[in-house]
């Protein structure tokens, strides 16, 4: 038992290490369950955390008037981060605006149990989502995005570029 404890400790530490993201996933439209972006010039992708391997890190849902996409990175412990998109009026491939006028928005949060920074698109800080695949039969949604979002705490805005997603809609 004494020999097993150090081995388990090392395995736990290895499993909970953050993986550096060296490149974004390729933009695809096959339901590959991928997501990535550059947040203020730093690459971001969903990641699990060793002690929470079953937590959902990427999900999408159709809603009556659009779609919601969530992507989470739990591996940056103690700070975790998340994207949420609510895109209204999705009716196939096309360009959709992220602003407060149409009800569509992008939201990005960093938190240590409670939020330490929150940003959301609005009438002044906007962006777009370009949906390239919207296959309701196969339940695949794919596309690209970019936006600048205002801080809800009065901090500097966040700039998100080179975004891409390819998700299976639940």
What are the residue ranges of the model-derived segments?
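Sec-dependent bacterial lipoprotein signal peptides
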Residues: 1-17
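Bacterial lipoprotein signal-peptidase II cleavage site
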Residues: 18-24
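Post-signal peptide N-terminal segment of mature Sec-exported envelope proteins
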Residues: 26-47
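Long, charged/polar, soluble alpha-helical segments
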Residues: 32-34, 54, 168
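Surface-exposed helix/loop patches within compact recognition domains
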Residues: 43, 51-138
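Residue-level signal for secondary-structure boundary sites
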Residues: 45, 93, 150-153
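C-terminal or internal capping secondary-structure element at the end of a domain, subdomain, or sheet
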Residues: 127-170
